[in-house]
Structure formats: structure tokens, C-alpha cells
Amino acid sequence: MNRLPLVAAQPGIWMAEQLSSLPNAWSVAHYTELKGNIDAPLLAKAIVEGMRQADTLRMRFVQENGEVWQWVDDAMSLPEPSVVRAESHDVAMALMAADLNQNLRVDSGQPLAFHQLIQVGEGHWYWYQRYHHLVVDGFSFPAITRQIAAIYRAWQNGEPTPASPFTPFVEVVEEYQRYRD
């Protein structure tokens, strides 16, 4: 295990979550509306591959003697998202709200990354994504979405999996520490 310190906004997020009584204050989520013929099993596999490429989504956190550490758990498996059918937009929104309104603190035991494909009609889908803010930021969240979409398109066309655009997190930490020094 390569223990890494919290960097950039992470210490503030960690501390704010410790001080907050809210069970989900540091969860970030959105859904993307998809229309047309979606190969849901293929998209589900592309989601797993895209998440695998972003090592921060396999991050674990521990607090020891007042210090917080994180590490990439290479053995962590990322499950395929569930594929569900909802009778309407309102039912789909209720499914997403139910996920987002549970205890999603970093120590809750809930996954720090969660995806769901919700079919709301023929050729009409919502792709729901939820992350803990310790593992994504405003740049990486849409970057992960774009990479998953690129993987899905490539696989639909029989092309190889696109290379990961993500810098390994250990290199991000090293660069951050050089900048701070």
C-alpha cells in the first residue's frame, strides 16, 4: 500500500465532512439524458472500464493518529452499474434522489463511485453518476464521463479501447508536493 497524503482541496473536504452532520454533503452527482438505441450491457461495461482507468475511483481513506491517508486499492473491483426501468421521469428522479439522500460519508461503507442506467422509455435513458468529492473534482468528473463515452463509441465500432487520459494519482501527488516545496 502506497500511502499518500490528501492534496489540494482534499484536506478541506475531509475536514468539512468531519464537521458536518449531513450524511451526503460531499457527494456530487449528475445524470446525462441519452436518446436513441443504447446498448445498455455494452455501455455498462464501458462505464466499468472508464472508471478503472481513473485510479482515484479506487481510492481508500484512513485516519491514523490525527493524520489522514489515502491509497489506490488496485484490488478493488468496480461493479457494473445496475440497469433499471422507470415508468416516468419522476420515478427516475426519485431513484436518483434515493441514492443521493443516503449516508454517503467517506466512512459509510457505501461506494465512493456509483453509476446507474435508467431506462425511462423506448430509446430514452438516464445515465446517473454519483461520486464522493474526495475522489473527483470539477475537472475529473466530466473527463471521466467523456472517457466512458469514448470507450463506448470505440467498442460500438469494433475499435480498441482508447488509452487512458488520466495521470496516475501518485504522479499528481508528487507534482503537488514539488509545487508546494
Regions picked out by a protein language model, each given a short descriptive name:
Residues 74-82:
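Short, charged/polar, Gly/Pro-enriched secondary-structure boundary elements
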Residues 2-72, 89-180:
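Acyl-group handoff/entry surfaces in thioester-processing enzymes
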Residues 84-86:
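Short acidic-hydrophobic, aromatic-tinged amphipathic segments that line or gate anion-handling sites
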